[in-house]
């Protein structure tokens, strides 16, 4: 169809004259239009044939682009670059994510320590070079699956391993920091509280027992912590350095605000050494001049006193208070006994003991002779006056005499003697009928007119 240029009437392409106005159409224009339409139709056919090829080419381009995008983010080199960038930029959160495993979660603070440790102990430039070379060798190798990057001192700091593939084409590289166990060994049962793996952690360590506090990646650590003992609560730090360990563990140094007490006693020469005690904050402990007591919190006053026995009597010092402001890591204090009071009492008791010993020497000299006479004559009456009637010892000796089983004794020596009211205990060294020296403990009763009688006896 075509339009009349004069009146606009529609007409067939082969019509020569317009039926509306009689205008005569140009035959050359019709021929041109026909040729143009044929060209368009030919071009359309060609275009339809090219579309599938264009789509295929476009898809191929997309695949190539996608491959390079995947390669940029998933190839071993790309994985290496992610870790390197995180360390270079001190991105502790990214490093923590990359190093965390199912069994050991690394928090951002631990990652921060790790980053600094790499820069100090390897050097960033050297670390990047070692990491790239290691990844390249593993990627090319058909047999090796893992390798370590080390510090200048030869300690392992990063494990690089092949762990399957990504998107079929790329080796999946795994970066894992080796761990060690920091260990504590407190002098008394201690509870430690600190943050690890992004969570609050509590560790209870028994006295003088090696106890691990967790698993940590390489670094030089100073972890804020609280510890609690029978002596109180302490604020401070747990410190440990991987450079100081060549094993699977690393010793922890405790840095807390604590005071240790050294005690010196004066005026205690007459006291029994084994009886000496120190009482700190109402807790009594055995005294030793070489012992350090504590630790105790530096933010609280400390009360301290000492006690000891002489001749069965307990003597104490005055209680002293050490102000918190005077407490230091090593704090020394001197406690004074009233030496004159102790010496007067000891002198008095020694006189009494000497008098008692003299009585006992006389008593046991007579008793040994009477005992032997009773044995020789088979007559209990010789010894009966030395033993309290009605006591189990009285009946036992009487039975032995009648059976002829009473043992002869000689040369009695008084080793020790104590009097409590009307009761006396004495340790006596004798020679028995076999000629052997034996120590026996006797209990006596002092009756009217200071008369002594045996109640019981036993071997020491």
From Swiss-Prot:
Keyword Zinc-finger: yes
Positions on the Cytoplasmic side per record topology: 1-49
Principal subcellular localisation of the protein: membrane
Record localization: Cell membrane
UniProt topology in membrane: Single-pass membrane protein
Cleaved signal peptide residues: none
The keyword Transmembrane helix is annotated on this UniProt entry: yes
Annotated GO MF terms: zinc ion binding
Keywords annotated in UniProt: Antibiotic resistance, Cell membrane, Membrane, Metal-binding, Transmembrane, Transmembrane helix, Zinc, Zinc-finger
GO biological process: response to antibiotic
Pfam family, one: TcaA_3rd_4th
Superkingdom per UniProt: Bacteria
Zn finger intervals (C4-type): 4-21
Transmembrane segments: 50-70
UniProt GO cellular component terms: plasma membrane
Extracellular topology ranges: 71-460
InterPro entries in UniProt: Mem_prot_TcaA, TcaA_2nd, TcaA_4th
Family: Belongs to the TcaA family.
Function recorded in the entry: Plays a major role in decreasing resistance to glycopeptide antibiotics.
PANTHER family referenced in this protein's UniProt entry, alphabetically: MEMBRANE-ASSOCIATED PROTEIN TCAA (PTHR40038:SF1)
Name of this protein: Membrane-associated protein TcaA
Organism per entry: Staphylococcus aureus (strain MSSA476)
């Amino acid at each position: 169809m075509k339009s009349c240029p004069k009146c606009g009437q529609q007409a067939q392409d082969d019509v020569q004259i317009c039926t509306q106005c009689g205008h005569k159409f140009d035959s050359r224009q019709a021929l041109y239009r026909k040729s143009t339409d044929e060209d368009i139709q030919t071009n359309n056919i060609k275009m339809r044939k090219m579309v599938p090829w264009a789509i295929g080419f476009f898809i191929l381009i997309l695949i190539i682009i996608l491959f390079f995008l995947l390669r940029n983010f998933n190839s071993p080199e790309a994985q290496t670059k992610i870790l390197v960038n995180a360390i270079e930029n001190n991105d502790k959160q990214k490093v923590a994510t990359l190093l965390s495993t199912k069994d050991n979660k690394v928090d951002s603070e631990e990652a921060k320590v790790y980053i600094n440790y790499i820069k100090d102990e390897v050097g960033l430039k050297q670390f990047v070079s070692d990491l790239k070379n290691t990844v390249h060798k593993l990627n090319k190798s058909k047999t090796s699956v893992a390798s370590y990057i080390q510090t200048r001192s030869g300690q392992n700091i990063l494990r690089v391993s092949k762990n399957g593939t990504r998107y079929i084409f790329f080796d999946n590289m795994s970066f894992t920091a080796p761990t060690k166990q920091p260990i504590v060994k407190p002098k008394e049962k201690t509870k430690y509280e600190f943050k690890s793996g992004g969570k609050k952690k509590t560790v209870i360590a028994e006295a003088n027992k090696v106890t691990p506090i967790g698993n940590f990646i390489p670094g030089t650590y100073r972890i804020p912590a609280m510890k609690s003992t029978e002596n109180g609560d302490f604020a401070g730090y747990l410190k440990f350095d991987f450079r100081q360990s060549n094993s699977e563990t690393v010793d922890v140094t405790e840095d807390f605000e604590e005071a240790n007490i050294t005690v010196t006693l004066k005026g205690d020469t007459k006291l029994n050494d084994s009886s000496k005690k120190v009482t700190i904050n109402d807790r009594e402990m055995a005294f030793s001049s070489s012992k350090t007591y504590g630790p105790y919190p530096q933010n609280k006053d400390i009360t301290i006193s000492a006690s000891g026995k002489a001749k069965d009597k307990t003597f104490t010092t005055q209680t002293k208070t050490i102000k918190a402001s005077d407490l230091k890591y090593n704090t020394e204090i001197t406690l004074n006994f009233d030496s004159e009071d102790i010496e007067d009492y000891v002198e008095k008791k020694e006189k009494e003991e000497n008098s008692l010993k003299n009585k006992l020497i006389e008593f046991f000299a007579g008793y040994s002779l009477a005992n032997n006479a009773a044995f020789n004559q088979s007559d209990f009456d010789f010894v009966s006056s030395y033993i309290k009637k009605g006591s189990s010892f009285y009946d036992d000796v009487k039975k032995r005499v009648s059976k002829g089983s009473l043992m002869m004794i000689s040369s009695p020596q008084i080793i020790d003697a104590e009097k409590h009211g009307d009761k006396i205990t004495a340790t006596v060294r004798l020679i028995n009928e076999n000629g052997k020296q034996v120590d026996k403990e006797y209990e006596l009763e002092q009756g009217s007119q200071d008369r002594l009688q045996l109640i019981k006896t036993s071997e020491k």
